[in-house]
């Protein structure tokens, strides 16, 4: 379990092959496959490599189709609770637009229902001091990327300029087409940019 994103528990694997198929056929990666024979049969990367030694981008599709919990997405829930219970910490949360719309379905609400108000109330009850909307940072990122694009126009490139807030997409490019690395925008994602702004804000506030 060396991957930053994926956790595997082979004791729960029933060898159905759903993860193998989605990785190969849907994602085009082919990281997972069957290895060994008979009672030793396992689903694993080729040559017994660890996930961080492969071209796995941590997209999470294998975890999404796993019905037994043999593959799950790693989380930091334990660390979050520790932070909330430490009186020395100021816990601040930012909520991305996709989260406030998608999360409702998990609790049986109609698809697309906006649960921002419920999220804010729940987070406050948990002990979160302040809750912010990442939409604000999306505007900051747009302005920064537009400025970077203008700078590239003036200086003759490099073109095209790629931009994505998805770390799995960036990882895919790094591993599969590294020749395009200089085409990726140097701007941070809205989440990273907002986190930096908040740290500066509270650093000045606490000074």
Task: Kindly label every feature range from the protein language model.
Residues 50-72, 174-178, 183, 187:
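Helix-enriched interaction subdomains in cytosolic or periplasmic regions
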Residues 5, 15, 58, 115-118:
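Residue-level preference for nonpolar/small residues embedded in alpha-helices
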Residues 73-207:
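Iron-sulfur-associated redox domains of electron-transfer enzymes in respiratory
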Residues 36-44, 51-60, 70-88:
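Terminal amphipathic helices with adjacent charged low-complexity linkers/tails
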Residues 2-8, 45, 61, 105-106, ...:
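Glycine- and acidic
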Residues 1-50:
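Ferredoxin-type iron-sulfur electron-transfer modules and their immediate structural context
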Residues 2, 12, 55, 112-113:
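Charged, low-complexity surface patches
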Residues 11-26, 54-69, 138, 164-168:
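Local cysteine-cluster metal-coordination motifs and their immediate loop/turn environment
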